[in-house]
Design a protein with these regions (language model features):
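Catalytic cores of DNA base-excision repair glycosylases
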Residues: 2-216
Length: 216
């Protein structure tokens, strides 16, 4: 079995095992996802969802967040940890969205990367889940799993894993498979290993032994 065939087979098995998988971050617009992924660093999605709801109640749009004192943002996001740096990034990011992008979240990967507090992992998450574009959220958990599954060979650098994975034919929309079918989160369900995603953009599921035991 080629690596391309293995990748497609893995995704198909996971889609059958978890047909209703979904992203655990709650959002109904690009702005909320952008804020959520910044707050999610070293924090659970469940707590992020609670905090973002409170933040959005007080500051319901880009303009409100851009004008808000950093101290007020920090007071709300503090339960997520790293409150000062996260509040500072959110404030700076909202100012750029207001002044450069007419209050809209850009759907271009490089433009997302230029925003304060947005790295490759966050940019890929927004690109895949919000805009439905091919994207791979590559973190240490993803790297460990794709190496274990044999989809990459001993590659540990996130950017290289991302690039190599894009070459595995995840772009085949007709087969309902794209690079956005992969996402790793630190939450754990069945295994003490991180969860693997396999359903459109960033659908969160845990990998059961019955699903993957024959992959390596």
């Amino acid at each position: 079995m080629t690596k391309k065939q293995r990748a497609l087979e893995i995704i198909e098995r996971l889609k059958k095992e978890y047909p209703d998988a979904g992203c655990s971050l709650e959002y109904d617009q690009a702005l909320l996802m952008l804020v959520s992924v910044r707050l999610a660093a070293q924090c659970t999605d469940a707590r992020v969802n609670i905090v973002v709801e409170k933040l959005y109640e007080k500051f319901p749009d880009v303009d409100a967040l851009a004008d808000a004192p950093v101290e007020e943002i920090e007071a709300i996001v503090k339960p997520c940890g790293l409150g000062h740096s996260k509040a500072r990034d959110i404030s700076a990011c909202m100012k750029i969205l207001r002044d450069k992008y007419q209050g809209k979240v850009p759907d271009d990967f490089d433009e997302l990367l230029s925003l304060p507090g947005v790295g490759r992992k966050s940019a890929n998450l927004v690109m895949g889940d919000v805009f439905g574009k091919p994207a791979i959220v590559t973190d240490t958990h993803c790297i460990r799993l794709v190496n274990r599954m044999g989809l990459v060979d001993g590659i540990r650098e996130p950017a290289k894993v991302e690039k190599r994975s894009f070459g595995r034919s995840f772009r085949r929309r007709k087969a309902a498979i794209s690079a956005t079918d992969w996402y790793i989160t630190e939450e754990r369900y069945v295994l003490p290993e991180p969860i693997l995603i396999a359903k459109n953009a960033v659908s969160v599921i845990s990998v059961k032994k019955s699903v993957y035991k024959s992959w390596w």
